[in-house]
Amino acid sequence: QTTYPGPAHLSYGQEASCVGEAYLLNKDDITFGSHRSHSEILSKGLSCINKLSDEELMQTMESFLGGKTLAAVKKFADTSDVKELAIRFLLYGTVAEIFARANGFHHGMGGSMHAFFLPFGIYPNNAIVGGSAPIATGAALYQKNNDKKGVVVCNIGDASLGCGPVYEAMNFSAMDQFKTLWEEGRKGGLPIIFNVFDNFYGMGGQTMGETMAYNMPARLGAGITPSQMHAERVEGWNPL
């Protein structure tokens, strides 16, 4: 019997939104977590497992932390099916990390709020509300400067839209200089998607009708670019 050693920000009811996001992503795409990132981690990981070859999966599992996590998984869940083994590897590594165990993806030092797995493009959540926005924007700038494949997805919650750094990140990602001053072949905005999980609450306050004034997060794109940042409002329980 084990007890959990710290706070946990769960994502009950938001799982379908994460699956819809991860469905089209691959390992070259990078995701930064929202405040409730457990289902984001699992969805992105499962999407990668489905798309990678058995050889790529085995190489990833065997090389990660010198194979220690894989060895722990094989003690109780060995199977000849590589994709099934990879699924168990993902689940075990994530849960062990959340429970601060040494066999977690980062020796349990990240915990619930900072679980991540870089080989699948899964970057950490942030304990600061909206904290992923400027970090993800910096990652997108790195991708653009270094001609890297893939897009960066910044997952944030509706309450983060009350945080100044989030708007700064959105503005930075779409600066006119990317279109007017950058060299040919690199012109255009940063390769980033700002995905807002709107569950109508931020801590104890309702963002719609109480603590915010936008009513719908998708409207905010109109204040950033003439194209409204290509903003769309998607039904989170039916994202596909």
Describe the predicted segments one by one:
Residues 195:
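Cell-envelope and extracellular/periplasmic
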Residues 2-192, 203-228:
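Cofactor-binding active-site loop characterized by glycine-rich and histidine/acidic residues
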Residues 198-200:
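Short beta-alpha junction loops
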Residues 228-234:
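Structural signal for short hydrophobic segments within the conserved structured cores
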